[in-house]
Regions:
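Residue-level recognition of strand-loop junctions within catalytic nucleotide-signaling folds
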Residues: 295-296, 326, 369-371, 412-414
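PLP-dependent aminotransferase class I/II
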Residues: 274-351, 356-360
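Hydrophobic residues in well-ordered beta-strands that form the structural core
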Residues: 170, 191, 249-251, 321, ...
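N-terminal basic, amphipathic alpha-helical segments
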Residues: 1-102, 108-112, 122-124, 303, ...
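Conserved core of the PLP fold type I
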Residues: 109-245, 256-274, 432-439
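Short Gly/Ser/Thr- and Asp/Glu-enriched loop/turn motifs at secondary-structure junctions
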Residues: 51, 139-140, 359-365
Length: 440
């Protein structure tokens, strides 16, 4: 596609065949064609639209392609199970009350830039919120704050990556934000094979020997999209390999809404591991409050990166989040969110229990392996026709990686129970009736 478009063989405005038609013509899987179309769109070579098709966009300007949005726009007439949105448990009223209390009682000025003194209460509250059981003993000075987990991950990558073509290692299926971050930083992204316990140490070592690598970016507690949890033994093996190969580790814990018993990698190798999370999935996405516990001796460097990038979080956000965390309101909200998510998971498992579903009661999405006859992209397209939006495995595959026949269903807690249950029932009906088509 790239060569044909750039040579002029395919002219601007030419409509490309539908995915399944082109797959049939070429004798390849629809998933492969769908990924090629998606990558071409990210490079600006083609333009796509629901119900419109895929058209040649002409010559792309390198570096200026507009990729798919990470935050999905919710359509009022559709049931959106693409993004794991924080359930409404009354936090809106709590946050409004905190804002009102701060407006009445705060003494410092909102005129100047935030500084180390005005940031300290939020850093201290975040350190206490994370706790020593998760990341080992830390002080507020070990905490660096960012605008949500995604931006905080990018900040950590900016701190540790160097050279003209840095290498990031990650899981073979990864949250799309990982691809966006790697592209933004002009880094090579290498996928590492996983099993039921997480990233395989033998495959990680093989990748390190073959490609090198400055950083391993992973989600050890809650992997998106598969719900996999990396065992403690496996985490210890990964930490040992990181020491052997002088590898930095960035653990993205943004999907964890509970208080896990096992330590994060930051506790196992504090000299080289970053722990990153946010309040997005457990309290509120609107606050855009992320935080990193940096490896020993690297917090000041990360703060310099943050200051160079965006000067720091707005002081009102710092004050609101510090109050939510220190007052106990954030913990009360988190516990309510955890209970609501468990209810949503129970409903999903009851509706889809006869299918191959991976789930955990504390994870706001399930991983559905499709029965024979369905592929991720075709099932997602069929769901879209029913006004149900889901994410196919193709959206989590790395550019050169393979995608299993599976989809991720985020458990949207902000629609009525009747609509939610109806959507799950419809999904189960569709799974039982795959399309009658040739399986390449």
């Amino acid at each position: 596609l790239r060569a044909a478009i750039r040579s002029g063989e395919l002219e601007t405005g030419f409509k490309l065949p539908p995915v399944r038609e082109l797959a049939w013509q070429l004798g390849i899987t629809p998933g492969t064609v769908a990924r090629a179309y998606k990558l071409a769109a990210e490079e600006g070579l083609v333009s796509t639209g629901v119900g419109r098709g895929t058209f040649v966009a002409g010559q792309a300007t390198p570096g200026f392609a507009v990729p798919d949005a990470l935050i999905n726009t919710v359509q009022p007439d559709a049931i959106d199970l693409r993004a794991a949105r924080t359930p409404d448990v009354g936090q809106d009223a709590v946050i409004r009350q905190v804002m009102a209390d701060l407006a009445r009682g705060h003494t410092h000025s909102y005129l100047d830039y935030p500084n180390s003194e005005t940031k300290h209460p939020a850093r201290a509250a975040a350190a206490a919120w994370i706790g020593p059981d998760r990341v080992g003993r830390i002080t507020p000075d070990d905490v660096v704050m960012g605008l949500g987990a995604q931006q905080t991950v990018i900040m950590a990558l900016q701190t540790v990556l160097y050279g003209t073509t840095p290498v990031i290692l990650t899981e073979e299926l990864a949250y799309p934000g990982v691809r966006h971050a790697a592209r933004l930083l002009r880094a090579q992204l290498i996928g590492v094979e996983m099993d039921a316990d997480g990233i395989r140490p033998d495959r990680l070592e093989e990748a390190l020997r073959r490609h090198g690598g400055q950083v391993l970016l992973l989600a050890a507690e809650v992997h998106s999209p598969t719900t996999t949890r990396t065992s403690l033994e496996r985490r210890q093996q990964i930490a040992a390999l990181a020491r052997k190969y002088n590898l930095q580790i960035i653990e993205d814990d943004c999907h964890c809404i509970t208080r896990p018993e096992d330590p994060a990698l930051r506790a196992l190798c504090p000299e080289r591991a970053w722990y990153i999370s946010s309040l997005t999935k457990s309290v509120s996405a609107s606050l855009r409050f992320g935080y990193a516990v940096a490896p020993r001796g690297q917090a000041d460097m990360a703060r310099q990166v943050a200051q160079s990038s965006f000067y720091g979080l707005p002081q009102p956000v710092l004050d609101i989040c510090a109050e939510l965390l220190s007052s106990g309101e954030a913990e009360r909200i988190r516990q309510k969110v955890e209970r609501r998510v468990a209810e949503q998971v129970k409903g999903a498992v009851n509706a889809l229990g006869k299918w191959d579903v991976s789930w955990r009661r504390d994870v706001p999405f399930v991983w559905l392996k499709l029965p024979q006859g369905w592929r991720g992209s075709s099932f997602a397209s069929a769901c879209e026709m029913e006004k149900i939006r889901i994410k196919a495995a193709d959206e989590f595959a790395l550019p050169d990686g393979a995608a299993p026949h599976a989809v991720r269903l985020a458990l949207n807690a902000n629609i009525s129970a009747a609509r939610y249950e109806g959507a799950l029932a419809r999904l189960s009906e569709m799974l039982a009736r795959p399309p009658a088509a040739v399986d390449f």
